[in-house]
C-alpha cells in the first residue's frame, strides 16, 4: 500500500469513527428526553417503565375528580374504556379539564394503577383529541 493510500485510509477511518461517536452521543441525548405514550390498559398490564417519564392518555372518568381542601392537589381517574388508573397531580389544571374530557398526562408510574402527573394537557377546541388517545380509544371500541 502506498503512503498516499495509507494516509487516505487513515483519514477515512478517523472521520468514520468521529461521525459514529457523534451519532452515538446524539442518540444517547435523545433517549434521555423521550416521553413515550401509554394507555391505562398498558400501564395496568405493567408495560410502562417505572421511574421513567412517560405520557398516559384517556378520558377523565365521571365523578372521579377529588380536589384537596387546601392547595392545588387533585386526584382523578382516566380510562381507555377497558382499564382505569388513578392520576394524582399538584398544580393548576387547564381550564378545559373536566369529566368526560380527553387528556394526556405526563409524569411517572408509581404502581400498576397509580400515576403521578407533572403536567396535564387537555384538548383545546371542540373537535380536537390527541392523536394517540384517539387511536387507542378507537382500537378499544373496535374490539
Swiss-Prot record:
Residues 30-143 are periplasmic. It is a single-pass type II membrane protein. It comes from the Bacteria. InterPro entries: CcmE (IPR004329), CcmE-like_sf (IPR036127), NA-bd_OB-fold (IPR012340). Heme binds at residues 124, 128. The chain crosses the membrane at residues 9-29. Keywords: Cell inner membrane, Cell membrane, Cytochrome c-type biogenesis, Heme, Iron, Membrane, Metal-binding, Signal-anchor, Transmembrane, Transmembrane helix. It is found in: Cell inner membrane. The keyword Cell wall biogenesis/degradation does not apply. One of its GO terms (cellular component) is plasma membrane. Gene3D superfamilies: Nucleic acid-binding proteins. Residues 1-8 are cytoplasmic. One of its GO terms (biological process) is cytochrome complex assembly. Its main location: membrane. One of its GO terms (molecular function) is metal ion binding. Heme chaperone required for the biogenesis of c-type cytochromes. Transiently binds heme delivered by CcmC and transfers the heme to apo-cytochromes in a process facilitated by CcmF and CcmH. HAMAP family: CcmE. Belongs to the CcmE/CycJ family. This is Cytochrome c-type biogenesis protein CcmE. It comes from Legionella pneumophila (strain Lens). The gene is ccmE.
